[in-house]
Structures are given as structure tokens and as C-alpha cells.
């Protein structure tokens, strides 16, 4: 007990455990990051705030055997126990991200908490109160750092898609430039779908044009189209599926694979299972109409996107967040990226709902994102028929400072600098033509954009897990 108590001094024990957890990507690393932030909140609250405000005499350790007591006992207030607060905060935070890891850490946290009574430096009520404080602060972190234990969103199951055994009737495009440049996913596709037509994307031509040509050549035998690549590749191929009213197959081989994770297709095997069984879900396809400028041809161009579109500095914000996310986690990375981007960003004058205003950025999600009033993180549903539009105003004094402060306190949705709408169609006009980014790629420049949801969702193959209970599910970190 004495050893456990000393090891937890200054939270060194928990930092060591966090280091071990952070060595693995995925939920383990996220658990470590949340645990460290929870310790910071619990320790500072207990030691810097509550102890000075609530002084309490420590127990008389002289009544205990010398081998049981500490050589250098603390002299600060006994209430509450900072060790118990940090232990409970760390264990609770870890359990929020990974219940399995939380179960492993909990006995160690309980040992540290009890050890403070055992060595005679705290009353039992100090430890109980400290543990409650730590657990409460860890749970409170969900207000600005939400927990998502599953990747895939809800979507309406469909029984109308054809069965594609061995990929018969499937035309797929494979983008080797997505993900690992040393690996060509086309070889894997040809092995998994021996009867499919696999097109290796050429970098000097538009990907959707290459897929369209392959579909034309295959003729009436085509029953579905698909793509292997990242979000940009998948979005381009999904546009072909939408135009031709064909079911869609997605195989995640990119770096982040946001759409595949939302749909719930984690690897090639899941796509093979779904196509062989004819299992699919309905997914909204978002459209953006790019209006012509005064000096261009009077033709409205329409682009498709599956995840998000953005104007202003939002693409830079996402780029920084994704670069830092593997080391820090999504929410700390987003907060840091927001500070950096807002510091050097230039406001954009836009007309929203008939009124001109200045914004730092404008975000459009294909479907409502959660959490509301905060940083958009995930979609609970894929077929809502709505767009999630958010913007950060720049026409209010100290808007950047207020936005960062509101984000840190989990109150962005209540701030005057923040705007949000959930609509089926949204029109925005810019005073000066600005660049549009869709699904992480800058694609157009115009002075006016109209966003809407396509009248019909696309059919995306996704296996029904209740029919595949014998399959292990992979996890994309």
C-alpha cells in the first residue's frame, strides 16, 4: 500500500500507464489522452481550489506502526484527497473510451485511493470525496470532448440491391495514390472480386470520367459501381452511382476513410460479405451547385459530396487537426488547430439567409452532425434528408477569443459568434469568389453556392452484423 501511494505522487503512476496506453493507436491512445486531461482537471481542482477553501486536519499518523506511515507526510489540507481524485479521474476517463481498459485500470485506482487511508494521511471521507470529484470531472469532459464508442451511423436497411457473387456485374475504380503509396489495392480487389471490372485510376484524368467510361464499355451487364480509396475517391465514384442510379460499393484504402467508417465498412472483407449477400443501406448524397461568375460561361456546375463541404478557413483547420490528431486525439487537436487558424485567418463576407455578414468559416455537413452546438464530429444517421450548416461569425468584437473560450468551456452553441441551421437546402453568396472544399479537397471557386440533398439516396452495400455473428470486426484507428 505504501508503495502504491508513493508511486502515485504527482500522478507519476498514471502518466506511466498513459504512456503504455498511448503506444497503441485507436481507443487505447484516446483513453490515455482523455485520462491525462482528466488528471489535470481533477488534480488542479482538488489541490489548488478545494484544499485552500476547505482546510481540514489530517489524521494522527503517529498512532500507526512506523513501517506503515510515510517518511515525509503531506502538510496540506486533508480534504479532499488529491491522489483519490486523480486515480478516479484517470480510471473513469479510460473506461469512457474503452470499458475493457477501464476494467483493468480500476483495481489499481482503487488501491491508490485506499492506500491514502492505509498510510494515515487521509480520512476515509477525504478519499470518497476525492474519488467522487475525479470521476465527476472525467464524466464532465463529455460536454466538450464527446465519446463515440462505435463508428457506423444508423441507416435504413435495403433489400433491393442485387447479389454480386465474386463481384459479377461490379465496376470498381482503385486509386493507388490514396493511403499507402507502396501498396496497390487493385490487386486485392481483383482477388476478392474475380468477376468484377477493376479500373486503375490514372492521375492525369478525372476519376469519375474514368469510371463512367468503364461503365459504358461494360454496358448492360453493370449492376453496381464502387471505389477503393480515400474520401475524395469515394465521393467521385459515388457521384457516378447517383447519376446512373446504381448501388455503390466502398472499400476503405485511404488515410482516414471518414465515409467508410460512418457507413460501417471497415475493410475489403466486409464489402465482399455485403455484396455476396445483397445487404445495403440508404445514404444521402449531398449536392452543391456552383453558380457561374460574371466572366464565365452561364452554366451551373453540380458537384457531389458525401461528408462535408466548407468555405473560408475551415479546410485549413481540418488539415491541421488531422495532422495532429494521431498524437493528441481529435478534440485537443481541434482546439489547437482552431487557435492557430483563427490567429491568421481572414474573414469572408457572405450573404446568409438574405443578410450580409462576415464569417471565419462556413461548414456544411451531409446530414446533422453531433454534437450540436460544438465541433462537428460524427453523424448519427445517414439518411436524414437534411444538411447541417454551421458558421463562425467575424463581425462581432473579439469573436476569435470568444469562440476559443466558448469551445473550451463547452458553450460554443450558446455563443453569439456561432450560427447553425439544419435545412434541406442552403444558399450562400460571397462578396469575392472563394474556394470551396468538399470531402477534404479544394475543388471549385465561385461567388455563389447552393447546397441541397439529392432527391434519392444512394444504395451502399453494408453487411448486417446480425447475419455475420461469426465474423470478427476490424477497427480503424
What are these model-predicted stretches?
Residues 354-356, 381, 391-477:
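ATP/nucleoside-binding phosphotransfer catalytic cores, i.e., glycine-rich phosphate-binding loops
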Residues 83, 126, 231, 252, ...:
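Short, conserved phosphate/pyrophosphate- and ester-handling motifs at nucleotide-, phospho-/glycolipid
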